[in-house]
Structure formats: structure tokens, C-alpha cells
Regions:
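Conserved lysine of the Walker
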Residues: 30
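Pre-P-loop entry segment of helicase/translocase ATPase cores
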Residues: 1-12, 16
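Walker A (P-loop) phosphate-binding loop of P-loop NTPases
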Residues: 27
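Hydrophobic residues in beta-strands of the RecA-like P-loop NTPase core, especially within AAA+ ATPase
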Residues: 99, 126-127
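Conserved helicase motor core of P-loop NTPases
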Residues: 10-13, 130-225
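Conserved P-loop NTPase motor core of helicases/translocases
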Residues: 46-116, 155-159, 168-182, 195
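Hydrophobic positions on the alpha1 helix immediately C-terminal to the Walker A/P-loop
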Residues: 33, 37
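Short hydrophobic/aromatic beta-strand immediately N-terminal to the Walker A/P-loop
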Residues: 20-23
Length: 225
């Protein structure tokens, strides 16, 4: 695997800055960059925490980096509503604090996470600042991206080669830019992407759409559980 220039610049920035913010849409290599950053820090004996809002996102970090990530609530030792054992009076003991899916974190939880970090700890936050805002008040990650300059912020724009093959990612990014991904003549089934992983089904009435949706769902349950 070879990193492109913007990815290398992002990795270097994250290893040399006290605060580093990484933003980019799906398929621009955030996970690969995260893997390199975690590897560099851990191999050089830095202590590190890796956190995400959801358990699924934390699991993805662990799978991608082999580094044990946790939810923010578990990292902070949540014992009740907005009650954490790791806090401004009892900081987390770590050289580097990494937060993934930063755009999903609301202002209240972000404040608790930030207060639990020591002044000498390096901070790395990754996410997509153009995603839907988090549940709860505040859109902290997006505000941070707009507030800091490119000495702190890395904006990834170049899609990785594998992402360019995915119909799901290509079409999602078109929709994100308010561009209709379907340009061909409508037919019952349209497949997009070199990987053929994105398909559309069209029917002439609501009942047919309902039937195909139920059938597809049941088939997925049968195959994937």
C-alpha cells in the first residue's frame, strides 16, 4: 500500500502537532492514515487512547489498527448520566488522545472528553465535518474545522483507488453534492460501480416496492443473521 501526498502530509502533521484535525468524506483514506498514526506512536512507546462515540465505530478502529479502542463513555469511565470517573480532576493518563467520528460528538460529551485530557497530551480528531450534525446541541467538529487553519486541519479530498471502484461510495458522494447518480434510462434493476455493490430497483407501484423491500430484507437476514 502506498500513501498519496496528502495522506503523508496528514500523517506527518499528526505526529508533529499538539492538535491535529483530520476531515474527509468516505473513501479518502482516513482509516489507513489512522493505522499509520497509531503504529508510529505505539512503536515509539507513546501511550495512547482511541475513542469513538459508538461501539461499532470503536470496533472498526480496533480492527483497522489492532489497537484496543473504546467508546468515549467507557474511556471516561461513565458511572451515570454525565458522570465520569475520568474528568477534569482526574485526567486520563496518556500521551496521545485519539477521537474518531468527531462529527458525531455533541458539545456536552466533547467537553467532558476534552476536560479529561491533560495539558501535555496530544490530541487527534478524525471525522467528516460535512456529515449530519450530532444528536444533541453543538456541531463542535465542524466548528473546529472552520476555526483552525491548515497547520492544524488536514482536509482529505482524493479518493483511494479501491473507493473509486465502489458504487456505494461514488454514488453517495454524488448525492452529497446534490448530483443525481442515476443518468441512464430507468429499468427494473440498475447496478453501479466496478465492484457492483450499489444497485437500484424500480417498480411501477408502491406494493411492488414494498414486496421487493421485504424480500430483500428477509434474504439478508437469512444469509447474514
Amino acid at each position: 500500500f502506498e500513501y498519496v501526498i496528502e495522506q503523508l502530509d496528514t500523517i506527518k502533521k499528526s505526529l508533529n502537532r499538539t492538535i491535529s484535525l483530520i476531515t474527509g468524506k468516505a473513501g479518502t483514506g482516513k482509516t489507513s492514515i489512522m493505522r499509520a498514526i497509531v503504529k508510529a506512536y505505539t512503536e515509539n512507546q507513546f501511550t495512547m487512547t482511541a475513542s469513538a462515540l459508538s461501539a461499532m465505530a470503536a470496533q472498526r478502529i480496533t480492527e483497522a489498527t489492532t489497537f484496543p479502542a473504546m467508546t468515549i463513555h467507557r474511556t471516561l469511565g461513565c458511572v451515570g448520566l454525565n458522570d465520569f470517573t475520568v474528568n477534569k480532576d482526574n485526567h486520563m493518563i496518556t500521551s496521545v488522545a485519539f477521537l474518531d467520528e468527531g462529527s458525531m460528538v455533541n458539545a456536552s460529551l466533547f467537553l467532558h472528553w476534552l476536560e479529561a485530557i491533560d495539558d501535555n497530551t496530544r490530541i487527534i480528531i478524525s471525522g467528516d465535518h460535512k456529515q449530519l450534525p450530532p444528536i444533541g446541541f453543538g456541531n463542535v467538529f465542524s466548528d473546529l474545522i472552520e476555526m483552525f487553519d491548515d497547520t492544524v486541519v488536514s482536509k482529505l479530498v482524493k479518493p483511494m483507488r479501491q473507493a473509486e471502484k465502489s458504487g456505494i461510495l461514488v454514488d453517495a458522494n454524488l448525492i452529497r453534492e446534490n448530483i443525481n447518480p442515476i443518468t441512464e434510462k430507468l429499468q427494473p434493476r440498475i447496478i453501479h460501480g466496478e465492484l457492483q455493490d450499489m444497485y437500484y430497483m424500480f417498480r411501477t407501484n408502491r406494493q411492488s416496492l414494498f414486496d421487493i423491500a421485504v424480500k430483500t430484507f428477509l434474504k439478508s437476514v437469512e444469509s447474514d443473521g
